[in-house]
Amino acid sequence: MAKGAVTFDGELKIAAQKYCDDWLVFHDYEVHLYVNDHSPTADDTLADYVECALIGYAAQLLIRSGWSVADPLAHAVLIEQATPRRFFPLGITVPTLVYGYYVTDEAGALAWAEAFTLPQTIGVGQWIDVRAKIRYANCPAC
């Protein structure tokens, strides 16, 4: 009895490119910053994220044609936006910690999220660049 199936790297990249071509470039997604200390999980809902509420902050539309598919590395393929979205809120008086970003689809539903390795501080005259990405892998533990 087989313990599980694994896709070879070449096929994995083909599948990731197909996902990108058939789904990501045909749908609108928005990227949002979140300010609560939360590590994303597969069971998350929008209620798990507290969106940034700084004056001048707004979620940003991801560019449909901006996705690129990298070569496989460690049995995973990274699909990411080529150009980062820059968040530059106005009127900041107190530095704010930003823990990561989440992405919503056209219906406003949570699509995916990523926590930053370390929380980023946004203060007076500062901004945060976010390059949205999806890790397309053989298995969740890969």
Which residue ranges define each predicted feature?
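Small cysteine-rich, disulfide-bonded extracellular modules of the LU/uPAR three-finger superfamily
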Residues: 1-99, 105-142
